[in-house]
Amino acid sequence: MANVSIRKYKTSDYETARFLFAEGTKEHLPAACMYTLTTPRFYFITFVAFTSVFMGTGSYVLALTSLVALLAAGWYGLYSEFHGLASRFLRKDMLDIEKSYMMSENACFWVAEIDGKVVGTVGAQPSTDADDELLLQRISVARDYRQLRIGTKLCQTVIDFARQRGFNAVCLETANIQRAATNLYERVGFKKSRVEILPSLVHQYTSFTVAYYRYNIKS
């Protein structure tokens, strides 16, 4: 079995850490598309679109063309959402990882390494909502290494850090389409605290939800 080591971020990890996070975010696009295709709202909208065009034109070809256009617009909307999300974070805390995570005693960034190769990342920062909570974020594991329990090790690293720094809980958020991530967090011991539908048009159309999880640290 591969020897996985978790260590603190170094400046030389910069490009790899950003790449892993961005790719991990964008790869949720297929799952998002499949999820959207199963929602009642999708069937309702496509039915209304097809029926309206057919009733207005009497043409099956135009009605089907309208469905293709609707699907293309939906795909582009999801594509823009996930690629835009990755870009926004790359321009925020991931733009200067050293400054965002390594210059405060209550924040940190780690990488998972196998044979000198960085294959995973995770960051932790104090919550802006509560002084006793630490946020787990920017967790990502390279696709070819996801059967090695690296995600579990990264989560546990953040939990241990929070305990050492005197925090009472570790919190995080994840989308409902991220099934593997949700299973990981629940397996580690995180408990779901609430679920929200974000106000953006894409989230309203697709019924995507964001779940908030909390891990209470025992004293």
Swiss-Prot record:
The keyword Endoplasmic reticulum does not apply. It is a multi-pass membrane protein. GO terms for molecular function: N-acetyltransferase activity. Its main location: Golgi. Its EC number is 2.3.1.-. It is an enzyme of class 2 (transferase). Belongs to the camello family. This is Probable N-acetyltransferase camello.
